[in-house]
Amino acid sequence: AFINDQIYVIGGINDANGLGSDDLEFFEGGAEFYKFAHIGWTPSKDERYFRNVHVMAWHVDEREDLGIDSAHGVTLAANWTWNDQIMAFARIGFSKGSAPIYNESATLGAIYKFLYRSDLVGLAVNHGSPPDDDLSDQTSVEAFWRFQFSQGLAITPSTICAFTCPICPIRR
């Protein structure tokens, strides 16, 4: 919800144990929640998807049945589009706990839009540090091309090159 023409806030709470396949059985693992609060700035409401800076804080409760400790974190992100054609984006996040995939993560990237077709091509690099000290950091690069066939139909092939594997133990 916008609180003025440039500042917006979003918040939410979800079942931390919820899955799309659990037939709407809410809180089966108990009242364990994922909560978030998000505040952002954009030059105008019309530009909110193309030019913005935002911060999000989150917390997930301990999930006793699964043996997962509570965790929390914060993310700062921004994207900016020039001439309706080139978008640069950046995101940095920090968290505490063993539940997140990464406790530290940074991403930089860019997207180019072909004005005559609405196709997009993008490239991003990410570096992340998993919460387990026995796992290595990961640096990866992703490239994609979104072929926009019509307003409601797009196909987006992508390729990812991971330079290290966080699920592989560090070789000593």
Predicted feature residues:
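Detector for outer-membrane/organellar transmembrane beta-barrel domains
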Residues: A37, W41-P131, A143
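Outer-membrane beta-barrel transmembrane strands
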Residues: A1-F2, V9-G12, A57, P157, ...
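Outer-membrane beta-barrel "beta-signal"
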Residues: R171-R172
